[in-house]
């Protein structure tokens, strides 16, 4: 920190400058390079930088007439040594630095670069904290760990794991990388359960590594992300192999430190390769190209078989080329190489032995920085271009799997398409690639040489029991109840489901049930669930409804019972009455139907009147025909034939309408007559809200808060009820006697209540949809495993058998309170019989009136003669009249048709008779005139 404050102090000494300027384009441009010569990355970078300088100097299109001169310094990843070497560079008038390699060095010399305006092009610093706002002259030519940690989080999320353990080197590189991992996991609702930091020099301390791994073994997660340096990483894997942590059940994800070693030392020594079997590794992705393949051929000639090329060697090469192209643009824009000194630094240098007067400021540093950032080129690592935040565009990683004597490519990750088995450069050509149909990763050979995906979590074998909260209910004990005489033993439907699910888990889960409640009234389930967040409970088992406010603080298993709020109210039967046959249609329907019958009859009469004799005749007859035809179509019994085309068309359509009306009427009437109708003044939750009647709810249920907060029902209307007996009494008394109009409760409780109380029923629909589940802390893997077990219970029928054991009641089921079939009684039909009887009596009455009129209107001649011959005895007259009445009733009456025909025939006979009479008279007159004849 003292060195940092020194450089901050120097930044204020910016007066009294004098300048050393090269007025012409220099023949040699000096650049520096700082990295660790002995590291895997440094060994490759040294060769790559030398080759890049050679290519720049031999290319006439870059810096024509100017040569690169590079000076390399070994920082050994030491902050102090890095600062010293950087100070030495500042004495040599360099215009740019390739490096540094390590985060600790980058943090130190970036402050110096800011003050002296010398761009730093780092090919290996992945620390995401290196911000361009804080370090404007720091340019990262590699990929940031921000993207690498995003890729790891995507892998963890893809396989459905929830918790990971992070092993990291305890310096800027490790801490900042793990912080980025934590953020990326948190954005996916995942988390780091345990962070194990190791000192960079811990590789030689076997005991410290062993103690750290033993702590990890006692934890539940089995996903380990290791973000360290090479030697430390291999030491961790060696001890993990010894402890059996490289076998079944574990998942190890290594950052790019391992892929760098795999690429540079291919193949790894057998003893090291054996310790990393099944590990997933990330490697910065570089697209394939002819330029890259040609460089690999050159590399084999340069290094032989002693050192293989890794990704960071490619980044080092591209860093030199980027600086060269930036300088080329700088010169073409008229830039000059010039340096300035501070007069104050000269004074300080003369007064001491620090030689500060030799430190110079690069006057063209800001212009060169802009030219570098504005350069676009295609190098060994693909397209080299920067985003506004100084990150490389199109970041991508290879995901490889160590198996056997080598590695397997199982997929890729990019910030454009996420996980995929398709090359990222192909997906970048699509605006929004659809990855739903393609596999995201290939099959992995996991530790233990298995293709089965590890669960990623085990129940910790540390001898501790899970503290499971159980509600101490005072009602509906079929669901959960404490066994009398015990403290931590419970029974009931919920307990049996939980026990059966736990027995299906592939690992043992020791639990201890802890009662919650005072035993006098049902406890608050929301408060009980909140105790999970405070650590009082490790879980809650019981009839706990899955509702929104609870899911925000805990995780629930798959619902093992359907639940939702319903309204229970008293009901009464509505029997079908004498006028039930009128109920299928309302008044308007009856009126419209009758009018339609008349209208169709009139229309058909109009269409048939001129052509059809059956629709002709006197007005009275035609009116009767219209009425008869209209209403006889109701039964398809009309006798009049239609002869016109239009008449037939209208009749066909009308008969189809009549068919539909008859069918609907018959179906509705059948339902009314054969099904009992149940009635309640409350039709559902909406009608209950509109009334001012009191509403009952179960103590401890979430129904109270739902009614108050969601439905805005006044608290004064809510009546707490504790037992089924209290339910029945409150409903029976009703609002007038201090009871309730209805009760709102969850369906399982209601079904159990109605199984023994048939005077009540559910009215309306279930107005919330939820279920019962077991509650555990957020992101608990146990909730996931138990959900799978509950689904298995449902599939094999065990869940239904447990339900039938505790909740199946035979005394009075809910169906008895629903609509049911019954026999038909006379009271349902006496109205029809009455109408029919009245019609019959009325017809008889009119008929007898007509007979009597005929009896007195047209007496026969024989009857008159007999009346004259007999005495006037009253009894004889009554007998005679009765005989005449009976004789008249028995006499056949001419039909109107026959009467009309008879009249016509009589008229014709009269006409012919008069003609014959007139002829006879003429003949007689003729004979009298001619007597001789």
Swiss-Prot record:
Polar residues: compositionally biased ranges: 908-917
Membrane topology label: Multi-pass membrane protein
Signal peptide positions on this chain: 1-23
Cytoplasmic membrane side: 609-616, 638-648, 850-933
Subunit structure: May form heteromers.
Protein name: Glutamate receptor 3.3
Annotated positions binding glycine: 543-545, 550, 702, 746-749
């Amino acid at each position: 920190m003292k060195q940092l404050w020194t450089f901050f102090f120097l930044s204020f000494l910016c007066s009294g400058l004098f300048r050393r300027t090269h007025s012409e384009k220099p023949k040699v441009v000096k650049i520096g390079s700082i990295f660790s010569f002995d590291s895997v990355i440094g060994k490759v970078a040294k060769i790559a930088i030398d080759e890049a300088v050679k290519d720049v100097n031999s290319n006439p299109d870059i810096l024509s007439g100017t040569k690169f001169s590079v000076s390399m310094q070994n920082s050994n990843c030491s902050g102090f040594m890095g600062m010293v070497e950087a100070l030495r560079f500042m004495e040599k008038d360099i215009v740019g630095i390739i490096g540094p390699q390590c985060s600790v060095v980058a943090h130190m010399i970036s402050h110096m670069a800011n003050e002296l305006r010398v761009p730093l092009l780092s090919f290996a610093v992945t620390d995401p904290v290196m911000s361009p706002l804080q370090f404007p002259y720091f340019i990262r030519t590699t990929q940031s760990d921000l993207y690498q940690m995003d890729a790891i989080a995507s892998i963890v999320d893809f396989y459905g794991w929830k918790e990971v353990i992070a092993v990291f080197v305890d310096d800027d590189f490790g801490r900042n990388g793990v912080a980025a991992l934590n953020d990326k996991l948190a954005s996916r609702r995942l988390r780091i359960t345990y962070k194990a930091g190791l000192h960079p020099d811990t590789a030689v301390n076997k005991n410290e590594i062993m103690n750290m791994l033993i702590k990890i073994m006692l934890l539940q997660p089995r996903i380990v992300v290791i973000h360290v340096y090479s030697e430390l990483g291999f030491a961790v894997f060696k001890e993990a192999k010894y402890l059996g942590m490289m076998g079944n059940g574990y998942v190890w994800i290594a950052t790019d430190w391992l892929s760098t070693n795999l690429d540079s030392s291919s193949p790894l020594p057998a003893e090291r390769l054996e310790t990393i079997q099944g590990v997933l590794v990330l490697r910065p992705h570089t697209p394939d190209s002819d330029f890259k393949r040609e460089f690999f051929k050159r590399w084999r000639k340069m290094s032989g078989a002693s050192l293989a090329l890794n990704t960071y060697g490619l980044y080092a090469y591209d860093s030199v080329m980027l600086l060269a192209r930036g300088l080329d643009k700088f010169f073409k824009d008229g830039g000059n190489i010039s340096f300035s000194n501070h007069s104050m630094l000269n004074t300080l240098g003369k007064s001491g032995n620090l030689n500060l007067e030799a430190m110079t400021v690069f006057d063209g540093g800001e212009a060169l920085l802009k030219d570098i950032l504005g350069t676009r080129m295609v190098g060994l690592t693909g397209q080299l271009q920067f985003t506004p935040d100084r990150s490389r565009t199109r970041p991508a990683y290879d995901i490889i799997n160590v198996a056997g004597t080598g590695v397997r490519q199982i997929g890729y990750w990019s910030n454009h398409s996420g996980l995929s088995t398709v090359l990222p450069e192909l997906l970048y050509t699509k605006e929004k690639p659809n990855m739903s149909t393609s596999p995201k990763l290939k099959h992995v050979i996991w530790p233990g040489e298995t293709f089965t995906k590890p669960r990623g979590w085990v129940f910790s074998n540390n001898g501790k029991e899970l503290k499971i909260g159980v509600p101490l209910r005072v009602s509906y004990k079929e669901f959960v109840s404490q066994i009398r005489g015990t403290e931590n033993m419970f029974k009931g439907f919920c307990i049996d489901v939980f026990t059966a699910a736990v027995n299906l888990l592939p690992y043992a889960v020791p639990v201890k049930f802890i009662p919650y409640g005072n035993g006098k009234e049902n406890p608050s389930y929301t408060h009980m669930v909140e105790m999970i967040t405070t650590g009082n409970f490790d879980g809650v088992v019981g009839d706990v409804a899955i509702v929104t406010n609870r899911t925000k603080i805990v995780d629930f298993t798959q619902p093992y019972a359907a639940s939702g709020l319903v309204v229970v109210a008293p009901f009464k039967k509505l029997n079908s009455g004498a006028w039930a046959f009128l109920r299928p249609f309302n008044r308007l329907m009856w009126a419209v139907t009758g009018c339609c019958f008349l209208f169709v009859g009139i229309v058909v009469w109009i269409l048939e009147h001129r052509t059809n004799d059956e629709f002709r005749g006197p007005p009275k007859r035609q009116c009767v025909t219209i009425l008869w035809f209209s209403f006889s179509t109701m039964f398809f019994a009309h006798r009049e034939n239609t002869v016109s085309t239009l008449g037939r068309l209208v009749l066909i359509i009308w008969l189809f309408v009549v068919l539909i009306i008859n069918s609907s009427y018959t179906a509705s009437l059948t339902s009314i007559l054969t099904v009992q109708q149940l009635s309640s003044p409350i039709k559902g939750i909406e009608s209950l809200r509109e009334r001012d009647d009191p509403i009952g709810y179960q103590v401890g249920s979430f129904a109270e808060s739902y009614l108050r907060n969601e439905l805005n029902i006044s608290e004064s209307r809510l009546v707490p009820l504790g037992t089924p007996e209290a339910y029945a009494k409150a409903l029976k008394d009703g609002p007038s006697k201090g009871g309730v109009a209805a009760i709102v409760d969850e369906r399982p409780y209601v079904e159990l209540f109605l199984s023994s109380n048939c005077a009540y029923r559910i009215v309306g629909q279930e107005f919330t949809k939820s279920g019962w589940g077991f509650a555990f802390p957020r992101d608990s893997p146990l909730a996931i495993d138990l959900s799978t077990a509950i689904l298995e219970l449902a599939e094999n029928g065990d869940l239904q058998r447990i339900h039938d054991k505790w909740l199946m009641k035979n005394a009075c089921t809910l169906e008895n309170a629903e609509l049911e079939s019954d026999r038909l009684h006379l009271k349902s039909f006496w109205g029809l019989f009455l109408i029919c009887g009245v019609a019959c009596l009325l017809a008889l009455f009119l008929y007898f009136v007509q007979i009597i009129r005929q009896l007195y209107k047209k007496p026969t001649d024989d009857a008159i003669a007999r009346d004259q011959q007999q005495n006037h005895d009253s009894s004889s007259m009554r007998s005679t009249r009765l005989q005449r009445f009976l004789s008249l009733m028995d006499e056949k009456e001419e039909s109107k048709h026959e009467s009309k025909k008879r009249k016509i025939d009589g008229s014709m006979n009269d006409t012919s008779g008069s003609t014959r009479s007139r002829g006879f008279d003429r003949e007689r007159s003729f004979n009298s005139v001619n007597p001789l004849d």
